[in-house]
Amino acid sequence: MREEPSSAQLFKPLKVGRCHLQHRMIMAPTTRFRADGQGVPLPFVQEYYGQRASVPGTLLITEATDITPKAMGYKHVPGIWSEPQREAWREIVSRVHSKKCFIFCQLWATGRAADPDVLADMKDLISSSAVPVEEKGPLPRALTEDEIQQCIADFAQAARNAINAGFDGVEIHGANGYLIDQFTQKSCNHRQDRWGGSIENRARFAVEVTRAVIEAVGADRVGVKLSPYSQYLGMGTMDELVPQFEYLIAQMRRLDVAYLHLANSRWLDEEKPHPDPNHEVFVRVWGQSSPILLAGGYDAASAEKVTEQMAAATYTNVAIAFGRYFISTPDLPFRVMAGIQLQKYDRASFYSTLSREGYLDYPFSAEYMALHNFPV
């Protein structure tokens, strides 16, 4: 354990929208498949989020949450459109708030990444263009103008539903090859109308979704997640990638959202190193506006290092979002501040559908339990 409290940048308070965080260690959104067949979070999901609200002033971002039945792409993922779903989320939010923490709901539409077997009731596999994820994969249908407008409205209604359920805000999932990203990136978007064909047009869908969500719930309740370099689901391969995301991020800055979340998935190209593992080019575009969350395999040491480096370069608005380590370490902020090693995670149980295994059975540190008088 640390001998003295650290003054590290990672441990300094940060205002995110309406939320006054006591440190800069965020729980990143992680899909876990612990919802029933109707997209209602299972009863024990409340305990999962409650465990990770272990240090007051922590921001948690939920797993990806479907905005409508048509947006569904996988079984056992939660939704936010029905009253039973919202009631389950109200209980989860109440549990998090009782621990003096904050929680944003991540809003999701899968597009062409959906499992075709899940698309029941005459739902089509849809995307920006009729371009499959893989060359011989299922062929999606390009959305029409009316459908695009309806999807934008659906994101706005989902945001209202989330705020009605008590969430402190929402995060728009514009990353990792899902529907919004399918409009942003030229590797998928082959349109030649006002939704494609140029950097500005490809960014339009993300911008209009964000604008509609802001109009619905307020800019200080809206975060946006992007993943410029992610190669997941056929993304991250376009030319003009940096200019595309520089433009989009500049537009998000003008919209004055509560935060920008930039995620780096595991780099898949073994032939060359990652061009920008800490998204420094995009941090510069974002500047000193609202907070910027960086995610991408950080541990305690690398999180402290990058926040110090960013602060030294005048970017004092940087926070770190932990995914896998927050799964395995419910008391993660406490451990990092105390200098206690983070717990190893079991990747095999990340997606153990409907199971408590690998979900509720990661222990708190002995030091945390002693401090909070847990029974031994």
Swiss-Prot record:
Ergot alkaloids are known for their toxic effects on humans who consume contaminated grains or livestock that graze on grasses harboring ergot alkaloid-producing fungi. Due to their strong affinity for monoamine neurotransmitter receptors they may also have clinical uses such as treatment of migraines, Parkinson's disease and cerebrovascular insufficiency. GO terms for molecular function: FMN binding; NADPH dehydrogenase activity; oxidoreductase activity, acting on the CH-NH group of donors, NAD or NADP as acceptor. Pathway: Alkaloid biosynthesis; ergot alkaloid biosynthesis. Induction: The expression of the ergot alkaloid synthesis cluster which leads to the synthesis of fumigaclavines is positively regulated by the brlA and stuA transcription factors. Pfam families: Oxidored_FMN. It is an enzyme of class 1 (oxidoreductase). The active site is at residue 178. Keywords: Alkaloid metabolism, Flavoprotein, FMN, NADP, Oxidoreductase. CDD domains: OYE_like_FMN. Belongs to the NADH:flavin oxidoreductase/NADH oxidase family. This is Chanoclavine-I aldehyde reductase easA. The lineage of its organism: Eukaryota, Fungi, Dikarya, Ascomycota, Pezizomycotina.
